[in-house]
Amino acid sequence: MQKLKVGDTIQVMAGAEASEKNPATKRGKVLKIDREAERVTVEGLRLVKRHMKKTPQSPEGGIVEKPGTIALANVQVVCAKCDKPTRVGIRTEGEEGKKKRFCKNCDALID
């Protein structure tokens, strides 16, 4: 079981995108995870500009902003209950032994 999934709300903790004055502004939803490169793409963060050529698939060329990638080690999952960035733990629950993710700060289930 993975500790970070697509659709999770995360906060950037370190790197160029981290904000020391107001860390809550650097939050977003995970769009894509590249496990081999250990990078994550987050909605609205680390926007990079790409110069696109006009093609039949994209008739409008020009400069387009796309989300870039952030190192997986620089982000943490935000708990929905305590609204803080947290480490994620995994435990088995119920008779079937299903694995569930939980917040290590407040012990609430993440999914």
UniProtKB/Swiss-Prot annotation:
Biological processes per GO annotation: translation
InterPro entries in UniProt: Rib_uL2_dom2, Ribosomal_uL24, Ribosomal_uL24_KOW, Translation_prot_SH3-like_sf
Keyword annotations from UniProtKB, A to Z: Ribonucleoprotein, Ribosomal protein, RNA-binding, rRNA-binding
A single Gene Ontology CC term: ribosome
GO molecular function (one): structural constituent of ribosome
Coiled coil: none
Entry-linked Pfam families: ribosomal_L24 (PF17136)
Entry's family note: Belongs to the universal ribosomal protein uL24 family.
Oligomeric form and interacting partners: Part of the 50S ribosomal subunit.
Biological role: One of two assembly initiator proteins, it binds directly to the 5'-end of the 23S rRNA, where it nucleates assembly of the 50S subunit.
This protein's name: Large ribosomal subunit protein uL24
Annotated organism of origin: Myxococcus xanthus (strain DK1622)
Gene of this entry: rplX
